[in-house]
Amino acid sequence: MNQEVLNIFNPVQAAPTFDQIRISLASPEKIRSWSFGEIKKPETINYRTFKPERDGLFCARIFGPTKDYECLCGKYKRMKYKGIICEKCGVEVTLARVRRERMGHIELASPVAHIWFLKSLPSRIAMMLDMPLKDIERVLYFEYYIVTEPGLTPLKQHQLLSEDDFMRAQDEYGDDSFTAEIGAEAIQNLLKAIDLDKEAERLREELAGTVSDMKQKKFSKRLKILEAFSESGNRPEWMVLTVVPVIPPELRPLVPLDGGRFATSDLNDLYRRVINRNNRLKRLIELRAPDIIIRNEKRMLQESVDALFDNGRRGRVITGANKRPLKSLADMLKGKQGRFRQNLLGKRVDYSGRSVIVVGPDLKLHECGLPKKMALELFKPFIYARLDAKGLSGTVKQSKRMVEREQPQVWDILEEVIREHPVMLNRAPTLHRLGIQAFEPKLIEGKAIQLHPLVCAAFNADFDGDQMAVHVPLSLEAQLEARVLMMSTNNILSPANGRPIIVPSQDIVLGLYYLSVAREGEPGEGKIFADLGEIEAAMDAGVVSLHAKIKSRFTEMDADGVVRRRVIDTTPGRMKIAALLPQHTAIGHRLIEKALTKKEIGNLIDVVYRHCGQKATVIFADQIMGLGFKEAAKAGISFGKDDIIIPKRKEAIVAETRTLAEEYEQQYADGLITKGEKYNKVVDAWAKATDRVADEMMAELQMKHKDENGREKEINAIYMMAHSGARGSQAQMKQLGGMRGLMAKPSGEIIETPIVSNFKEGLTVQEYFNSTHGARKGLADTALKTANSGYLTRRLVDVAQDCIIVEEDCGTTRGITLRAVVEGGDVLVSLGARVLGRFSAEDIKDPATGEIVVPADTYLTENMADLIEAAAVQSVKVRSVLTCEAKIGVCGACYGRDLARGTPVNIGEAVGVIAAQSIGEPGTQLTMRTFHIGGTAQVAEQSFFESSNDGTVRVTGATVVGTDGFLVVMSRNTAVSVLVDGKERENYKPPYGARLKIKDGDKVKRGQRLADWDPYTTPIITEVAGKIRAEDLVDGFSVREETDEATGIAQRVIADWRTSARASDLRPAMGVLAEDGSYVRLANGGEARYLMSVGAILSVGDGDMVKPGEVIARIPTEGAKTRDITGGLPRVAELFEARRPKDCAVIAEMDGRVEFGKDYKNKRRIKITPEVDADGNQGEPVEFLIPKGKHIAVHDGDFIARGEYIIDGNPDPHDILRILGVEALANFLVDEIQEVYRLQGVPINDKHIETIVRQMLQKVEILEPGDTGLIKGDHLDKPEFYVEQDRAVARGGRPATTQPVLLGITKASLQTKSFISAASFQETTRVLTEASVHGKTDTLEGLKENVIVGRLIPAGTGSYLRSLQRVAAKRDEQLAQQREDAMEPLPAVIAEEA
């Protein structure tokens, strides 16, 4: 049939296209203009005839017919009467669909305040009127009168009068001398009377004239709201409603159930309440009822409208018949079940199915097995079309019948349809983008989906009953994107870290590991073979074994690209693997001449991908998988109880440690150490013992035993599984055959008595009981952490969703400086690895020769990273998203490599979402990883440095020779570095009080200890000799004798002296006196007085003689808590939320000398006085007040550098940003977050964290507005601020000064430019209230807003379409302009002719 004819019957209206959405307050006129009629009655439908009642909530006259093209009374039916209004029932003949679009309204008999603008904090009405919210509520709910016009009476404007006061005032001043009103009318009139511009002008003047901070804040808040109203064109009185809109009836349906009952939307109940009360109020006013009754009715009307908009926001919740709170309009939007998250962001998808997954080892990497039943259902429309095209059926009905009967020709057609038509598989939870991938379906019998084993890691799938969903991309574009972007073969690398994610695991690894093992004394050792064929023949004949060390000819490509054959040392097993390697200069047999563990295989796949490309990698991965499965099956590796080896020296080690622990108990009994120190030492000793037993066990497992013929025995099967990375870990083996070790209490503390048994020996009852804590905590953690981690991911996605690559290069010269990550002498991440895939921001020079290794603006590849490593470059400045100057989004050069592709990133890549997923995805896995080790405690305390190079030591900073002849570190800026050939290779900062085992200029060997210290106490050390004088150490106030119950030994401990009023001005200290009784002078000229902090244990007494380097007191540090990601996830969240840590560090604001000033109440006063600079200027000193008893890390007279800690602890990120700037903050956040993930062995690229941090730093705070017209203390988006700044400078005004502001991810998400995105995240009511007051416009730039309004997202292929649209729009403008230009001379011509 002709398309035009069809269109008459089914008019398809083109969806209106729009580029932005604006939200604002609706005026009463606007509400009436939307409406199709006033609703006067609370009735819904006639329950006998099921027809809507006239003028009721479902009235057909107002909202439209209930059946297509049919009026209510049935006089006019069918298309031909379209548009006619029936004179009998008044219904327009049109589509029933209009009942979804047409609105009505209710004219209120008395105005009503809109609850959102009244109660949503900060209350907009209260701010407009500059009154407390409580007072406004009293007026609204008819408790008090408010004076609106005082006249000549002494009453004040906005004064509240109770009923009695009002009467009294009327008696006293006369009825007409003043006006006072009550209820919403009063508020409405007051709002009407506000002159926005005048009021704003007055506030500006007051702002300029005030110095008080409180007033400035108050004025600027009110000024903002006034400006918002005047700029958006909203009027304040519109916050009070005189007309209530009624939403279309189809959006609040009434559905008949069987049995004559109805199911209805709660909104109908709420509307009926409003209409009933409104009608009653109208009637009462007509009847001239007494004031008190009318007032009561008005108050009830106000309450019912409140409940309609936001039930429960004020007063008690209105409930329905079944005691359940009614769902109001606000509840429809809010929360997980609200409109935004349930229906707009989380739609259900057609053409999808789900089923259990089973393994498909014979599939290719790009295939999945799809059950025929499912395929038939999913591809129905395609099958119908193909049947029709082939002429096998005439109608759709016929096709349907054929498919339902499963006739033979249908199966052939299904095969045709499915060929080359990819489907998408998804496994919930989809934590990162690899949770949905496309495959080519392969029809299989049965009902389960077959999945390729190698993609399991990406989906985090296993085959213990997991289910997966299948989705069919319908349009050609969707199929194309599925094939080009989502095909499993295009997702070989992980977007989080750029390493292969298609890596063999479990059986495959075991098979390949077994193949690659070489053993001494095997049959056929030393034989030489021509090729693999000959080797296989020999193996079949039993002449040579799989692991024999043989020689064989092998063909590979030389460095110059020539294929050569040469004889190599190998084994038959390794030759089998080598046969699969692709031919390339960089890939030779040397890559597999070792035992292939999981890690090695991963590196092998990485090398193949980097050098031979994607296709070769996919083929290689598939082949290697087949080989691994086959060989693992043939090897038949299994283990029994006797394969678990208990080390011979276990008993000795345990006995030794027991003795040591008893020794510590004795020292504690003798009072040499405190209870806390004893606990720490005992725990430490057992932790070391556990490790020693484990090491012994591993050593025994690795030992190679030979039989009488000199042939090596099979390797232990458990060791093989763990060492290859197939299953199990050293930690698990330790528990099977070593000792289980220390356990943690539920609180996280470590139980002092370890579990000495292992699982093979079996646990005693007490040991079993102790071990249950850990196991139970692990399970409880899992449940809690999964939710936490999911929430973290959601916040991250929300804050970063509009971070998209928008241009190739923003042209900035800024960047950040990267260094290698070194911890305790081990390089954890090399500099080469950190800079890989970035662009250099400046020339990278060889530190020794000064030659340029890599020029600026170069994309750093693997080869360049190797060059940088070889030149021993210490630090490299690279481009980073943090310093990118693109106006919206970021540029490609600042981002660098797209980790999932291994090439520079494309325009349109949604890097923000990828960053969020990369950080959030392991969070969920980590949370689940606590209980795998059964809660065994791991103590993470570092107490020494070792050199990791041979070289020369350089010591800088203050040291003093201690009592035992070693140097003792005396200042906090002491550094120990190791030089190799004059280049600094390592740099350590030993803590205060550490003992240096070397002197400046000593030669050291690799692994030599440089320094050690007690990790459990911080000492206070004297640097001079003399006699101790105790100051202000008053027994019972600042010192208490602590007698240990267990030992009876007394120790003197500094008590908290601030608690008693008499002692509050004490300053407990230890002085060192010279012969003449005066203080000994320190090197910096200060007196040798050492202030004591609360909890310090005194090691010397009054009158004792001390030598330099002697400890005069010890401050115990907290006990060792175990660290697993439980500490980790909340730590990551704390960092991303930019919260102030509790007991945070105090950071010096500038360089200068430290002075202790006069104490203030119970605070210590520390003053930092800057040094006099070259010009003789001296800055203002800065003071800090620090609670007494906190241990201060600096001493009187020390020189301190800006950014150093005065009090140790976790620093507050806001402080770092303020004092040290953006780069220092970025480095701090990246390092801290990486440390948490590194502890769990999860690699994440730094740039993902940087991307999130960039989103947290989007805003600036105005310090001085200059001539920009901005308000001091305001927070603005950077782009908006630059626009204002440029405007002011162009006018010749003074620019504003600003400072960057760090916002936590939740705050940053809520303050995003797009109100749609913010409203769908959290606090929907607040966001929408604010947006409507400001009359905000959403320009639909991010991903989320576009999903919500149902458009293509502006990322990936969508971003390209966006750019095409922009170009087209510009062309349209130009064409229109040209047309206008061409049209201009015409009238003159016409005039001439005339």
Swiss-Prot record:
| SMART domains associated with the record | RPOLA_N
- Bound how, and how many: what does the cofactor note say? Binds 1 Mg(2+) ion per subunit. Binds 2 Zn(2+) ions per subunit.
The residues that the entry says bind Zn(2+) 2 are C810, C884, C891, C894
Q: Where are the transmembrane segments?
A: none
- Name the positions where Zn(2+) 1 binds: C71, C73, C86, C89
Pfam annotation, one family: RNA_pol_Rpb1_1
- Residues bound to Mg(2+): D462, D464, D466
What EC numbers are recorded for this enzyme?
2.7.7.6
Cofactor dependence: Mg(2+); Zn(2+)
**The UniProt record lists the keyword Repeat:** no
Describe its assembly: The RNAP catalytic core consists of 2 alpha, 1 beta, 1 beta' and 1 omega subunit. When a sigma factor is associated with the core the holoenzyme is formed, which can initiate transcription.
Tell me the function of this protein: DNA-dependent RNA polymerase catalyzes the transcription of DNA into RNA using the four ribonucleoside triphosphates as substrates.
The protein here is known as: DNA-directed RNA polymerase subunit beta'
